[in-house]
From Swiss-Prot:
This is Pyrrolidone-carboxylate peptidase 1. It comes from Ralstonia nicotianae (strain ATCC BAA-1114 / GMI1000). Its main location: cytoplasm. Pfam families: Peptidase_C15 (PF01470). InterPro entries: Peptidase_C15, Peptidase_C15-like, Peptidase_C15-like_sf, PGP-I_bact-type, PGPEP1_Cys_AS.
Length: 215
């Protein structure tokens, strides 16, 4: 039976919760499309987050890995296309670290692309009434750090897994503390993650559908 590892983060930047972990942990132990779902929390800390993820990858040997993170200000589930090899933190992480213009992996590739069927996921999410889009940037904070670290590990540690990253909006309770910022209900995010998992397990190839942006 396939194993799907889904990760979320602990809260950061003085938020009381992180919607990624609140949604992800709901799926732990469930069976989706014939696969076992395993969920784990990652620390919002440069370096340590990748080390924790690496240990999980080596012990679980999952078939699919979907990392999920909070993106306050976004209004949709953002299915990330690419991870870039740079840390450039606008704020400090949960350990007080704030790397600037630093390679995640010295001498590593400039970028890695998601191996999830990102456009098919967006298509299925929209069909189910969940706002979603392909995102062209995962930022340069710990989310991109983990996304890059995940894809680098898959490429270099002999893992036969597909992987990628999904950003999600604030929860409504969080958005109440950030007037004017969009949010997405917990149940909608959980349903969206189930769709993303199901679509990934069902499709080995992505669909051809416009998902780019002009700027």
């Amino acid at each position: 039976m396939p194993t799907v590892l889904v990760t979320g983060f602990d809260p950061f930047e003085n938020e009381p919760v992180n919607p990624s972990w609140e949604a992800v942990r709901t799926l732990d132990g469930q069976g989706i499309a014939g696969a076992d779902i395993v969920t784990r929390q990652l620390p919002t800390v440069f370096g340590e987050s990748i080390r924790v993820l690496d240990r999980l990858l080596m012990s679980l040997r999952p078939d699919v890995v979907i990392a999920v993170g909070q993106a306050g200000g976004r209004a949709e589930m953002a299915i990330e296309r690419v991870a870039i090899n740079v840390d450039d933190a606008r704020i400090a992480d949960n350990a007080g670290r704030q790397p600037i213009d630093t390679a995640i992996v010295a001498g590593g590739p400039a970028a890695y692309f998601s191996t999830l069927p990102i456009k098919a996921i967006v298509h299925e999410l929209r069909a189910a009434g969940v706002p979603a889009s392909v995102s062209q940037t995962a930022g340069t904070f710990v989310c991109n750090h983990v996304f890059y670290g995940l894809m680098h590990a898959i490429a270099h540690h002999g893992l036969h897994a597909r992987g990628g990253f999904i950003h999600i909006p604030y929860l409504p309770a969080q958005a109440a503390g950030h007037p004017g910022q969009p949010s997405m209900a917990h149940d909608t995010v959980v349903a969206g993650l189930r769709i993303a998992i199901e679509t990934t397990l069902r499709r080995q190839e992505d669909i051809r559908e416009a998902g780019g942006q002009l700027h």
